[in-house]
Amino acid sequence: MVRSKFKDEHPFDKRKAEAERIRQKYQDRIPVICEKAEKSDIPTIDKKKYLVPADLTVGQFVYVIRKRIKLAPEKAIFIFVDDILPPTAALMSSIYDEHKDEDGFLYVLYASENTFGDLEQYAISE
């Protein structure tokens, strides 16, 4: 698991208290920390913390990230939660329930390539 810069910069107790406060105040939203994967050549996002509607899909969240980093349409982007590529159609609430951190935030990494898996296994040979 890749270490989050947000975790390094903020003590556990403060992160946990903030996530609890957010969840109490906005029960239909999910607290997400979105960070760029370290060795990715993709632009850095301008803000890390997001309050995401529970019924937003992973694909819709990827669209939000693309817009925030002003990524060209022809450029690929992948997001990872706990080093896995979540299904595009999955609801963020499901991903949160399965992968939220002990501090109450969902940590998402984004990259310009699939850095955690080998896409070659899915290649179609002619």
Swiss-Prot record:
GO BP annotation list: autophagosome assembly; autophagosome maturation; cellular response to nitrogen starvation; mitophagy; protein transport
CDD domains: Ubl_ATG8
SUPFAM superfamilies associated with the record: Ubiquitin-like
Zinc as UniProt keyword: no
Alphabetical list of InterPro entries matching this protein: Atg8-like (IPR004241), Ubiquitin-like_domsf (IPR029071)
Transmembrane residue ranges: none
PTM field: The C-terminal 9 residues are removed to expose Gly-117 at the C-terminus. The C-terminal Gly is then amidated with phosphatidylethanolamine by an activating system similar to that for ubiquitin.
Gene Ontology, cellular component aspect: autophagosome membrane; cytoplasmic vesicle; fungal-type vacuole membrane
A single GO molecular function term of this UniProt record: phosphatidylethanolamine binding
Covalent lipid sites (Phosphatidylethanolamine amidated glycine): G117
Topology in the lipid bilayer: Lipid-anchor
Keyword annotations from UniProtKB, A to Z: Autophagy, Cytoplasmic vesicle, Lipoprotein, Membrane, Protein transport, Transport, Ubl conjugation pathway, Vacuole
Positions of the propeptide segment: 118-126
Chain spans, region Disordered: 1-20
Subcellular location: Cytoplasmic vesicle, Autophagosome membrane; Vacuole membrane
Family: Belongs to the ATG8 family.
Role according to the record: Ubiquitin-like modifier involved in autophagosome formation. With ATG4, mediates the delivery of the autophagosomes to the vacuole via the microtubule cytoskeleton. Required for selective autophagic degradation of the nucleus (nucleophagy) as well as for mitophagy which contributes to regulate mitochondrial quantity and quality by eliminating the mitochondria to a basal level to fulfill cellular energy requirements and preventing excess ROS production. Participates also in membrane fusion events that take place in the early secretory pathway.
Protein name per its UniProtKB record: Autophagy-related protein 8
Species assigned in the record: Cryptococcus neoformans var. neoformans serotype D (strain JEC21 / ATCC MYA-565) (Filobasidiella neoformans)
